[in-house]
């Protein structure tokens, strides 16, 4: 499945579908890590999370939900820089916390303003992994907090 425009290969699922004249529902794309075919829900989730496809040879790959979470955990251990509250993020980036692109460190979804504000109100730290700020989305927040709640 080669991109129609070889000089600039598609970066997103949406672009790939347009170039190949496919619907997202009918797209068959493999996970770059485990090589399994993503389910329809995973294809839509990948697009919703604003993640980029990767090209290996002439073929596009995405990442399944399980591998995204595993990679998130691996990144925590391998690339942890430091943790800090919202003020630290703002000092580090010289931007308002609401303007900084912060992704969930498990599912990789960009955090919305409400999710960032939850970190502030709950006095939860953001973590810097491999020079990028990460936090927890609503979905992953509960699964992250289950282990520390009585």
Curated annotation (Swiss-Prot):
It is found in: Host cytoplasm; Host nucleus. GO terms for cellular component: host cell cytoplasm; host cell nucleus. A zinc finger (unnamed) spans 31-67, 104-140. One of its GO terms (molecular function) is DNA binding. GO terms for biological process: DNA-templated transcription; regulation of DNA-templated transcription; symbiont-mediated perturbation of host apoptosis; symbiont-mediated perturbation of host ubiquitin-like protein modification; symbiont-mediated suppression of host innate immune response; symbiont-mediated suppression of host type I interferon-mediated signaling pathway. InterPro entries: E6 (IPR001334), E6_sf (IPR038575). Its main location: host cell. Keywords: Activator, DNA-binding, Early protein, Host cytoplasm, Host nucleus, Host-virus interaction, Inhibition of host innate immune response by virus, Metal-binding, Modulation of host cell apoptosis by virus, Transcription, Transcription regulation, Viral immunoevasion, Zinc, Zinc-finger. It holds the Pfam family E6. Forms homodimers. Interacts with ubiquitin-protein ligase UBE3A/E6-AP; this interaction stimulates UBE3A ubiquitin activity. Interacts with host TP53 and EP300; this interaction inhibits TP53 activity. Belongs to the low risk human alphapapillomavirus family. The cancer-causing human papillomavirus E6 protein has a unique carboxy terminal PDZ domain containing substrate but low risk E6s do not possess this domain. Plays a major role in the induction and maintenance of cellular transformation. E6 associates with host UBE3A/E6-AP ubiquitin-protein ligase and modulates its activity. Sequesters tumor suppressor TP53 in the host cytoplasm and modulates its activity by interacting with host EP300 that results in the reduction of TP53 acetylation and activation. In turn, apoptosis induced by DNA damage is inhibited. E6 also protects host keratinocytes from apoptosis by mediating the degradation of host BAK1. May also inhibit host immune response. Belongs to the papillomaviridae E6 protein family. HAMAP family: HPV_E6. This is Protein E6. The gene is E6.
